[in-house]
Amino acid sequence: MAAETSAQTRDIFLQIRAGSASGRIGVGIEGFTSPDTSSPVNIVHDTLIGDLNGSGLYQTRALPDSIASHNQSSFLKWTESGAAYYLSGALSGTGKSVAVKLYDLKTTLVTLDAEYLIDSKRPWYTAHVLVDDMIKLFTGLRGSCASQIAYISESKGGKEILIIDADGRNMHQLTFSRTTNLSPAWSPEGQRIAYSSLNGINWGLNVININTGQSLNISRWGGLNTSPAWCPTNPDLIAFSSNRDGNNEIYTCRANGTSVKRLTNYQAIDISPAWSPDAAKISFQSDRTGSPLVYVMNSDGSNIHRLTSTPNSYEDSPNWSPRGDRILYVVQNGSTFDIGSSSPTGEDLVMLTMGEGTNENPKWSPDGLRIVFWSTRLGGKSLFIMNWDGSGVRPLTSDGNSFSPSWAPAASGDDIRVSAKR
């Protein structure tokens, strides 16, 4: 029954994603509070509401009269409030954990039954992990609330890589090279970041361990090596652009720089590779027809074709949804740039930003529900997050010196989740 319920909820999500169903999935919440205003569980409650409403998938519903029991009568009240699901949280006697149950109000089945620790130093993380679990239950992919985002900042004595939690907390610097670093890209397991770094007259490819800070130059052949993209199904394979053979082409190599393979061979500039989630295809930017446009090829370099027939004058920064159903890219809009989304066949281009400064470098969240990008809409370059359909835009940074974001893989939550029954 749980599997059947999960399949039904995923159908609802797909309908919302495709535009055939309107609105968000209503969730009623009770519990997750304490009369002690200093209790960390109150922060869990507030964060939970923010995460659900900011997910692009859920919408919390107003609490009806207090419900004393989980029965048909109480479920009817929640249904009347517009909720499709009811989430209850019971604080443990010690206050150090919360027992959670998620009810399907249509079937009255418990679809999630789990216990989560509450870390008093970061109680919000409990809510992040819970919502990520709910998103996986509904969509098949873990949510992005507990994940991190790497980006470039110009405010640290150079262009350095920084990492920030997806909620804007815990910003910290990763590189201290005092040079120009660009295009950070996370490895599939989330422990390494590949990036391009200026070393003298050469642009090298580096891989850094985010735990130790140890960095390795993997492009010992010199020249211009940029825009690394880690293969989503192989933690030992990286696509990148290089002029090592005289012209900017797309290549792949192992994570230590060996086994270099050339994929494109054309007298044009080919850059910015991006893998499909199954690693069967790669999208990239090329000016082979005179203007920089987005192309798609098989991951072995065959069947190169333009993504869309739309008469754009400039396209850049393709990024494939982890669900495989959409490709983000940047389109020139007069003197500025905006972010669009189309299917992998190039159909139904939808503009997600329009008329609010320049908007570039879009990257999908690991659940395919949100997008991080940089924009000048507030002056300078700052990071913003929006929902997959362009709604709910909110700032992540505000320093005016942040760009080139990359969303990390989803966090497992195993350090917070004590037990789970589905």
Residue positions per predicted region:
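C-terminal/domain-edge helix-coil "capping" segments
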Residues: 7-23, 106-175
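Short beta-strand->alpha-helix linker/helix-N-cap micro-motif
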Residues: 9-77, 87, 91
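Amphipathic beta-strand/beta-sheet edge segments enriched in Tyr/Trp
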Residues: 72-133
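Structural motif
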Residues: 97, 157-162, 202-206, 247-251, ...
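Residue-level detector of Asp-centered blade-edge/turn motifs that repeat once per structural unit
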Residues: 143-145, 188-189, 232-234, 277-278, ...
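Hydrophobic beta-strand positions that form the internal "hydrophobic ladder"
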Residues: 149, 190-193, 237-239, 279-283, ...
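Multi-bladed beta-propeller domains
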Residues: 165-182, 208-226, 253-269, 297-314, ...
